C-alpha cells in the first residue's frame, strides 16, 4: 500500500473485500481521498477476454455484463466505505440496500480498462449513500446511486 499516493494494490484490496476470483471486480485503487469536504475513490477493473462469463455473453460479440459493471462499482464503494471506517472486523460486510438511477451508455468489451469513480454522499440510520460513475477512455459507460448497510 502506498499511503502517500493513496493507492491500494490487489493485496490491500483482498484485505478489505471478501470477494475472490472469478467475482473480484476491482484490480487496483489508483487514488482515494478522505478529506472533510469529500470522500472519493478511483479504482480500475481490467477487462480480459479470459473472464469466464465471456463464453456465454456473447460468444460472437463479447460484452461485459452491465450487472457486473454495477458489481464493480459496488465493490469500489465497499472499499471506500472500509477506508472511511477502518479495516473490517472478521465477518463484517457492506451489503447492498439499493441501486437507483442506473444508466448504461455504451458497451464494455475485452481489452477495455473500466475506471470506477465513487463518492460518499451521506449516511442516515446506518444506510450509507454513494454515487458512482464508470468510464472507459474517459467516455461514460455507467452511472448509478448506491446505498449499502454495514452488518
Curated annotation (Swiss-Prot):
Annotated Gene3D superfamilies: Hotdog Thioesterase (3.10.129.10)
Gene Ontology biological process terms, A to Z: fatty acid biosynthetic process; lipid A biosynthetic process
Enzyme class: lyase
GO-annotated molecular function: (3R)-hydroxyacyl-[acyl-carrier-protein] dehydratase activity
Keyword Magnesium attributed: no
Protein biosynthesis listed as a keyword: no
SUPFAM superfamilies cross-referenced by the UniProt entry: Thioesterase/thiol ester dehydrase-isomerase
Localization: Cytoplasm
Catalytic reactions on record: a (3R)-hydroxyacyl-[ACP] = a (2E)-enoyl-[ACP] + H2O
Domain of life: Bacteria
Gene Ontology CC entries for this record: cytoplasm; membrane
Predominant localisation class: cytoplasm
Active site, per annotation: 57
Alphabetized Pfam families for the sequence: FabA
Keywords, sorted A to Z: Cytoplasm, Lipid A biosynthesis, Lipid biosynthesis, Lipid metabolism, Lyase
Entry's EC annotation: 4.2.1.59
Coiled-coil spans in chain: none
Physiological role: Involved in unsaturated fatty acids biosynthesis. Catalyzes the dehydration of short chain beta-hydroxyacyl-ACPs and long chain saturated and unsaturated beta-hydroxyacyl-ACPs.
Similarity comment: Belongs to the thioester dehydratase family. FabZ subfamily.
PANTHER family: 3-HYDROXYACYL-[ACYL-CARRIER-PROTEIN] DEHYDRATASE
Protein name as it appears in the record: 3-hydroxyacyl-[acyl-carrier-protein] dehydratase FabZ
Protein's organism: Tolumonas auensis (strain DSM 9187 / NBRC 110442 / TA 4)
Gene: fabZ
Amino acid at each position: 500500500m502506498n499511503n502517500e499516493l493513496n493507492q491500494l494494490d490487489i493485496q490491500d484490496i483482498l484485505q478489505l473485500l471478501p470477494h475472490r476470483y472469478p467475482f473480484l471486480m476491482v484490480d487496483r485503487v489508483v487514488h482515494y481521498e478522505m478529506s472533510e469536504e469529500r470522500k472519493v475513490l478511483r479504482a480500475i477493473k481490467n477487462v480480459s477476454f479470459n473472464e469466464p462469463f465471456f463464453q456465454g455473453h456473447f460468444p460472437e460479440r463479447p460484452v461485459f455484463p452491465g450487472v457486473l459493471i454495477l458489481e464493480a462499482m459496488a465493490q469500489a464503494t465497499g472499499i471506500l466505505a472500509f477506508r472511511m471506517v477502518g479495516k473490517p472486523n472478521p465477518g463484517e460486510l457492506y451489503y447492498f440496500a439499493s441501486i437507483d438511477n442506473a444508466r448504461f451508455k455504451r458497451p464494455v468489451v475485452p481489452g477495455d480498462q473500466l475506471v470506477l469513480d465513487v463518492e460518499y454522499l451521506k449516511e442516515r440510520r446506518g444506510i450509507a449513500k454513494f454515487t458512482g460513475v464508470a468510464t472507459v477512455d474517459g467516455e461514460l459507460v455507467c452511472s448509478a446511486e448506491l446505498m449499502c448497510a454495514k452488518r
